[in-house]
UniProtKB/Swiss-Prot annotation:
It is an enzyme of class 1 (oxidoreductase). Binds 1 FAD per subunit, which helps bind the antibiotic substrate. Substrate binds at Q192, R213. It comes from Bacteroides thetaiotaomicron. GO terms for molecular function: FAD binding; monooxygenase activity. NCBIfam families: tet_monoox_X. This is Flavin-dependent monooxygenase. The gene is tetX2. Encoded in a conjugative transposon. Immediately upstream of this gene is an N-terminally truncated tetX1 gene that is inactive. Its EC number is 1.14.13.231. Anhydrotetracycline, a poor substrate, prevents tetracycline degradation in vitro. Optimum pH is 8.5.
Amino acid sequence: MTMRIDTDKQMNLLSDKNVAIIGGGPVGLTMAKLLQQNGIDVSVYERDNDREARIFGGTLDLHKGSGQEAMKKAGLLQTYYDLALPMGVNIADEKGNILSTKNVKPENRFDNPEINRNDLRAILLNSLENDTVIWDRKLVMLEPGKKKWTLTFENKPSETADLVILANGGMSKVRKFVTDTEVEETGTFNIQADIHQPEINCPGFFQLCNGNRLMASHQGNLLFANPNNNGALHFGISFKTPDEWKNQTQVDFQNRNSVVDFLLKEFSDWDERYKELIHTTLSFVGLATRIFPLEKPWKSKRPLPITMIGDAAHLMPPFAGQGVNSGLVDALILSDNLADGKFNSIEEAVKNYEQQMFIYGKEAQEESTQNEIEMFKPDFTFQQLLNV
């Protein structure tokens, strides 16, 4: 016996409901755009004060077949291409010798060009209806009522929603209605920083990059740099977390000299151009590498419709470039499920998305984790990873 699905009913799953997206990063904003294209009432609650808030971090590269597909569906792919910068890669050793260079061929310039995080946010914000994003909203509590969720914010009025989508990053504090899984540290640590006007402030290192991203490794210390992040040079240094840091980080990241002293000791046998980079930096950010493992199934019984996308769903080590791209695939699949009439209920649409996400999310986490293992071996070189 074939069951007939009432298509008109399905097309209106969310027609009289409102969706709350927690988090205004690229994944949350893309989700909002894709829902809005289908006439769905959606609000994004973001803790930043306003759209001018500077987002710290390196550039993002959206991949063909994943992140770019979501941008295409949103009608924003060409705008991304217009602002993104195709960049080659220089592989260097600790002495400042360029071991190999991987340049971008003209036919590959749109494969994964780099874009500044604020530029990507601006593209997405400009595509949304006015007042879609509600700024200065730090979510402190989520409570299910009889028919709607109540969202409580710090020092702001409460809101309600029929469906909640958590897109508020890897350290989300409101996952309990979806899963009891906890974020785990992987055993490596990252120190990041920006240098403005690098051509003036660290000319030796800037010239070493020569317009390309630069990667170097030596005895378990990794350095990544992008000399062109909207006029700033962004770099990151990664290493295995020292044993004495297991309970408490032994470097005070509020004290610049404390970080500089630590890094100069770690880089004592590196070329002076790398030390120039460290000496020039005015402030540093330190972060343990973390993962939100997709090992246990999420809760099948939830009081009201709720799910997670992006890092909130599958935070992973940043060693395969899969994080934001997997998150944009989340937005693409979930928005399609909610709007295309295939499912009888919001819960069914969410369940199907999560089943798909667990497959590609696990694969991305496994690739990132395997890269992390390989990259922190003493004899690792970026040449073996990038095949250059």
